[in-house]
Amino acid sequence: MIILFDVGNTSIYTGLSNGTNIDETFRMNTDIHKSPDEYFVTLKSFIDPNVITGVIIGSVVPLVTQALIALTEKYLKLKPVVIEPGTKTGIFVKADNPREVGADLIANAAGLDNPHPTLIIDLGTANKLIYVKNQMITGVIIAPGLQLSIHALDGNTALLHEVDIKVPKKYLGNNTIHCIQSGVVYGTIVMIEGMFGRIREEVGEDFDVIITGGLSSLILEHIRLDIKQDKELVLKGLLNIYKKNIK
């Protein structure tokens, strides 16, 4: 089995693949203080390490990247594929400094299975809108994610506190909890809807839209756009990149 690590700032979205399909997924908490040994103990609670024959790491957290590399080499006796400059991805990047482009953006783009221009909406710690055409990332929008927005209100105001991410029944709230939920959740929905129109004006062409990420189901239910969902898009991209880099 091939293990696919998508390391985000909040969690490590992990997939297991037979080389063709994504067979199983699970999440581990991202913790920059965890040692390779501790991550291995956590990993063993999900999968028998003896069945792992390949590893790929796509990460936006350098300390965790190093921990997973050490885990792979020490316990699995394997050399992992790591998405970094020089790794074959099949994705081109239109950017002032391509080295700054996150592994998550590249893996999402690599997960697409059609040649049509596509806007990928990835909802995580940060919300990313990634425009891909002809296997090239031509532009990206990054905004605070839902949980990050709630943390910001909780951490920087005296009277507003952290609330659960839920969709309130109406836009105009009548208590603090519903007011925050409306601002964060509906605010994200309206941001996406508004950016969709502005992006279409800018690119001057029709495009597919795919939504992914841990909170994609919540947003998809209420957004007024024709969108397809693919929760495993980033893992599919990691698998495609892995195949390009094994001998």
Swiss-Prot record:
Keyword vocabulary terms for this entry: ATP-binding, Coenzyme A biosynthesis, Cytoplasm, Kinase, Metal-binding, Nucleotide-binding, Potassium, Transferase
Record: residues binding K(+): D122
UniProt xrefs under InterPro entries: ATPase_NBD, Type_III_PanK
Residues involved in ATP binding: D6, V7, G8, N9, T10, S11, I12, Y13, T125
Function: Catalyzes the phosphorylation of pantothenate (Pan), the first step in CoA biosynthesis.
Subunit structure comment from the entry: Homodimer.
Protein name (database record): Type III pantothenate kinase
